[in-house]
A protein has these predicted regions:
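Protein kinase-like catalytic core scaffold
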Residues: 148, 208-209, 253, 265-267
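Phosphate-binding site of ATP-dependent enzymes
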Residues: 159-244
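Glycine-rich phosphate/pyrophosphate-binding beta-alpha loops
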Residues: 270-282
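Conserved N-proximal alpha/beta basic substrate-recognition cap immediately N-terminal to
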Residues: 10-126
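Extreme N-terminal starter segment of soluble prokaryotic enzymes
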Residues: 1-4
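A long amphipathic alpha-helix within ATP-dependent nucleotide-binding catalytic cores
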Residues: 219-266, 288-300
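Rossmann-like NAD(P)H-binding beta-loop-alpha module
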Residues: 122-146
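ATP-grasp fold ATP-binding core
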Residues: 119-120, 142-159, 182-193
């Protein structure tokens, strides 16, 4: 069968992950198809929906795949650009192709506010959070929290994340975000046990492994220097991760969970997780599980 690795042409944040996926597809005896969302064209007619792609002025070719793995949608510079890339993936799905993660579920899970909103509504433990375009409401949230973390809604790897305990310092950050037409996403800072958090990796409704990411500062992202350590997740950790993926409809994800004196809190969900630190610490390659999940779904 033909398995499409879906991503943009112009950028790749984690090339080793792509290489792992392509190698896994070949090891299972199937063919890799590279699908670039920003080089694709959606065609609508009486015959239905079809998708083509061409690299620049290259030859237009139909996107004919049996299954797809969505990695990410690239550096987004405009709302319409984001929507178009989402609908390119939706068009592939409309052709009857199973894509993991599906475009709409990926869109929700990759948005911090949308993801935690769904989890909070379902009764799962999330940090106290406030999101607004009103900088004075965000200012009041920092005052109320005492110590807070300010993030972008769609950031990753711990970049552009600030810890503040002075609301007036936070106001400078808020002014910058507003100048970029970005909302303010503020969370109460958690005192995490072990100065880190857990990354629980779920594929196809099963926990395949977990790591504890021990931070060197207050951040616990591997991209920020945190040390990944293989752990055996507790039953409660696994249950939280599985419920999270079920609520968000994800076929694969990394679920970040912190342990505090008040219990566990789900920090973020990563539907485009990078797994090199996880693979190094555990010896488990998520790519093989993801590819097998897609193949098994195709063969149903």
């Amino acid at each position: 069968v033909d398995i499409g690795i879906i991503r943009p042409y112009e950028v790749e944040f984690n090339q080793p992950d792509i290489e792992d996926l392509e190698q896994a597809v070949r090891e299972f005896g199937h063919r890799v198809k590279r699908v670039y969302v920003n080089m694709a064209s959606v065609r609508l007619s009486r015959e239905g929906v079809s998708v083509y792609q061409a690299i620049g002025r290259g030859v237009r070719e139909p996107v004919n795949i049996d299954g797809g793995i969505l990695r990410h949608l690239g550096l987004i510079r405009d709302f319409e650009q984001l929507l178009h890339r989402v609908w390119v993936v939706r068009a592939i799905e409309a052709m009857g192709v199973y894509v993991v993660n599906s475009a709409m579920n990926w869109l929700v899970a990759s948005d911090k506010l949308a993801a935690l909103m769904m989890l909070a509504k379902s009764g799962l433990p999330v940090p106290e959070t406030e999101s607004s375009e009103n900088m004075f409401m965000a200012y009041d949230a920092v005052k109320r929290f005492g110590e807070a973390v300010v993030k972008e809604l769609r950031g990753s790897m711990g970049y552009g994340v600030f810890k503040v305990n002075d609301p007036d310092v936070a106001m400078n950050i808020f002014s910058h975000l507003l100048n970029l037409s970005k909302p303010m996403y503020v969370q109460r800072f958690l005192n995490k046990k072990g100065n880190g958090d857990y990354r629980v990796v779920v594929v196809g409704g099963q926990v395949i492994g977990a790591i504890f990411r021990r931070g060197v500062g207050w951040k616990s992202n591997v991209a920020q220097g945190a040390r990944p350590e293989a752990v055996k997740p507790s039953g409660e950790l696994m249950e939280l991760a599985l419920k999270t993926c079920d609520i968000l409809g994800l076929g694969y994800a990394g679920v970040d969970i912190a342990e505090t004196d008040e219990g566990y809190f789900i920090l973020e969900v990563n539907p485009s997780m990078s797994w090199q630190g996880f693979k190094e610490a555990t010896g488990i390659n998520p790519a093989r599980y993801i590819v097998k999940h897609v193949i098994d779904h195709i063969k149903r």
